[in-house]
Regions:
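Conserved catalytic core of the tyrosine transesterase superfamily
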Residues: 1-266
């Protein structure tokens, strides 16, 4: 039955990671509890809550519920745990640290300077960033289609476009992927994440705030500070719901601390 469930997931266009994650949850349940029944399912949920973060708990429960639908036992489906929404943004690179990193890289490593610039000035996810080609820079945007066929257009601001075209001309590149590794192949998302951590250490910046998605957060924060249109930002970020974008209206924990220190004198 487990194998058939895995085959079902693969045919239903779930991503490889989701298939593996769901299959792992089912294996985990059967190894610990053996039989599918109401009591065992509740015990499994309690065990998950005691051992994992809420986000992981809900991922496992989603897998279990999917499996219960598959075996026609939907009446046993479990409710998800409520995730307390944080009132602040965590681990977002500050404007000062971003500018410092950007300026250091511009002097020391122009290729990595451009990676950081593109991340922060386009709001691209790192998986989207590595798809940029010279042709997209010339156009001033890239169109990316999700698995569901939804179009996401990522714009390249004119200032960045001009800078990138000069950079590409200087290295005599007129086509193909623009972000390459030392072997001349398209760089990987893991390669970007790992090298950014090294730069954080080199330039004495907190490594916790130097990772690809941090620059996407920086893009959103800066955008709202300059142009307070959350609906437009949601479109630019490729968010399905505007509620996802609302997090950027919040302060970072550091900004909250600074405000408290400044405002409260009683």
């Amino acid at each position: 039955m487990h194998t058939k469930f895995k085959e079902y997931l693969e045919k239903t266009n779930f991503s490889k990671n989701t298939v593996e994650s769901y299959y792992f949850a089912i294996e985990q349940f059967y190894q610990q509890y053996g039989d599918i029944n109401k009591r065992n399912l509740k015990n499994y949920k309690v065990w998950l809550i005691e051992n994992y973060k809420p986000k992981t708990v809900n991922l496992r429960l989603r897998a279990i519920n999917c499996y219960l639908d598959f075996i026609n036992k939907s009446e046993l489906k479990l409710t998800f745990v409520k995730i307390q929404q944080k009132t602040y943004l965590e681990n977002v690179i500050s404007e000062a640290d971003y500018n410092y990193l950007k300026n250091q890289l511009k002097k020391d490593d122009i290729d990595w300077y451009m990676i950081v610039r593109f991340l922060a000035a386009t709001g691209a996810r790192v998986s989207e960033l590595i798809q940029f080609k010279v042709e997209h820079v010339r156009l001033g945007y890239i169109d990316i289609y999700s698995k569901g066929g939804k179009l996401r257009r990522i714009y390249i601001p004119k200032q960045l476009k001009d800078e990138a075209l000069t950079w590409l001309a200087n290295r005599n590149q007129d086509s193909g992927f623009i972000f390459l590794n030392k072997y001349g192949n398209r760089i990987t998302t893991r390669g970007i994440s790992g090298q950014l951590k090294k730069f954080a250490i080199k330039y004495d910046i907190n490594p916790a705030v130097v990772y690809p998605h941090s620059f996407r957060h920086r893009f959103a924060k800066n955008f709202l500070e300059k142009y307070n249109d959350i609906a437009l930002l949601a479109d630019l970020m490729g968010h399905e719901s505007i509620e996802t974008t609302r997090i950027y209206l919040r302060k970072t924990s550091t900004e909250q601390q600074e405000l408290v220190d400044t405002l409260i004198d009683w």
